[in-house]
Curated annotation (Swiss-Prot):
It comes from Streptomyces griseus subsp. griseus (strain JCM 4626 / CBS 651.72 / NBRC 13350 / KCC S-0626 / ISP 5235). Belongs to the phosphohexose mutase family. Mg(2+) binds at S104, D246, D248, D250. The gene is glmM. GO terms for molecular function: magnesium ion binding; phosphoglucosamine mutase activity; phosphomannomutase activity. GO terms for cellular component: cytosol. It comes from the Bacteria. This is Phosphoglucosamine mutase.
Length: 452
């Protein structure tokens, strides 16, 4: 069996790859693994279970709840809430485990299972590996040890989760949003109720789009992967800014008053300055990834802020933040982590903090985001090559040195192996788009000839 867990839980086409049987089995396995790790020692264990609104979440939720309860875990079922809400509630309610059913920005037929440990943190790799091992052992015939009588778990609908999470969001804001008009695109997803309520309670005038989930329309032409509707709505309504989430609202992208996109790097730049001014940017450092735009790095250097870059993935950003004690990190895609207030990317919190900075300064989002200038970026995927030689080919190394010499300080080259396919990704940033395209094209040709 190949590894079930990816960088963000277990995902697949619901009822094909991710079946009710798999969801139930993984939940029982997770309960057994956490029990043997001592997480449940000395008390009756509790889990928080939430989901996004896609149709398959209903039967998968039933399977997860059944699995946990059959393993002796009491379940607080919080219903449709964002991933960061489930993480927050897992921590604030003192639960031993959290489970979120979502495939984030993926299309409706997909779904996923993500586990959180006590405190609302993602499970460590070794625990995920152990869950897979235990699941496979029992799938192939070894019986479970099952509680009976009063030992089985009880299931409760925890209806206070919505208000508790919104109150948390409002409570950590540095200032109110009175006077701001904000358009919210909720991707017909998990934040369709939460985000508009939070922005309204914070004082903003709110216009919503993509906030009518029917189980089938999640991420369908809307949300953070499709900004066209948000751009048009912001201009149409004369709003100060627009905020877009994905299906589980763990990410946030923005649009300024003119309908121009403000990406994750720009959001990080705005928040880094806000947190520095408030004395909250620990070690004057922000964490990004190797894909963070060079313009972001240059802007932070001008402001005396250090950028630490990790491998691609919010998991690696979070690991760096926790290990080094940094307060802010994220990705260009809009995963932003404010570690003092969240254990994972939180799109609603990010949007609120961005709007709060606009309200506090009286400056437009375009002006604030202008602290950094995005350098044109070109990405070319070169398939069917020996990706393992990307760092050892002398021919390729020579071509990279020549490209870097041509680009100078206002450009950069990044070659990355795909983690799942036999391809190499060539990324080039330059002062203008034509130069970036030319350099990327030449490097892609060398990759093809040297590694093909």
């Amino acid at each position: 069996m190949g590894r079930l867990f990816g960088t963000d839980g277990v995902r697949g086409v619901a009822n094909a790859d991710l079946t009710a049987e798999l969801a139930l089995g993984l939940s029982v396995a997770a309960a057994h693994v956490l029990a043997e790790a001592g997480t449940f020692a000395g008390h009756r264990p509790t889990a928080v279970v939430g989901r996004d609104p896609r149709a398959s979440g209903e039967f998968l939720e039933a399977a997860v709840v059944a699995g946990l309860a059959s393993a002796g875990v009491d379940v607080l079922r919080v219903g449709v809430l964002p991933t960061p809400a489930v993480a927050y509630l897992t921590g604030s309610l003192g639960a031993d485990i959290g489970v979120m059913l979502s495939a984030s920005h993926n299309a409706m037929p997909d779904n996923g299972v993500k586990f959180f440990a006590r405190g609302g943190h993602k499970l460590a790799d070794e625990l995920e590996d152990r869950i897979e091992t235990v699941y496979e052992q029992h799938r192939t015939g070894e019986p479970w040890s099952r509680p009976t009588g009063a030992g089985v778990g009880r299931v409760t609908d925890y209806t206070e989760g919505f208000d508790r999470y919104v109150a948390h969001l409002i409570g950590v804001l540095p200032n109110r949003l009175d006077g701001l008009k904000v358009v919210l695109d909720e991707a017909h997803g998990a934040a369709a109720r939460v985000s508009p309520e939070a922005f309204a309670r914070a004082g903003a005038e709110v216009v919503t789009i993509g906030a009518d989930p029917d189980g089938l329309n999640i991420n369908d032409g809307c949300g953070s992967t499709h900004l066209e509707l948000l751009r048009a709505a912001v201009v149409e309504h004369g709003a100060d800014l627009g905020i877009a989430h994905d299906g589980d609202a763990d990410r946030c992208l923005a649009v300024d008053a003119a309908g121009e996109e403000v990406d994750g790097d720009q959001i990080l730049a705005v928040l880094a300055l806000a947190m520095r001014d408030a004395g909250q940017l620990r070690k004057d450092t922000v964490v990004g990834t190797v894909m963070s735009n060079l313009g972001f790095k240059l802007a932070m250097e001008r402001e005396g802020i250090r950028l630490v870059q990790t491998a691609v993935g919010d998991r690696y950003v979070l690991e760096s933040m926790k290990a080094e004690g940094f307060a802010l990190g994220g990705e260009q895609s809009g995963h932003v982590i404010v570690l003092d207030h969240a254990t994972t990317g939180d799109g609603t919190l990010t949007g609120l903090m961005l709007a709060a900075r606009v309200a506090a300064t009286g400056r437009s989002l375009a002006e604030l985001a202008g602290v950094m200038q995005r350098l044109p970026q070109v990405l070319i995927n070169v398939p069917d090559v020996d990706k393992t030689r990307v760092n050892t080919s002398s021919e390729l190394a020579t071509a990279v040195v020549e490209a870097e010499r041509e680009l100078g300080e206002n450009g950069r080259v990044l070659l990355r192996q795909s983690g799942t396919e036999p391809l190499v990704r060539v990324m080039v940033e330059a002062a203008d788009i034509e130069q970036a395209r030319a350099v990327a094209g030449r490097l892609a040709d060398v990759v093809k000839s040297a590694l093909g």
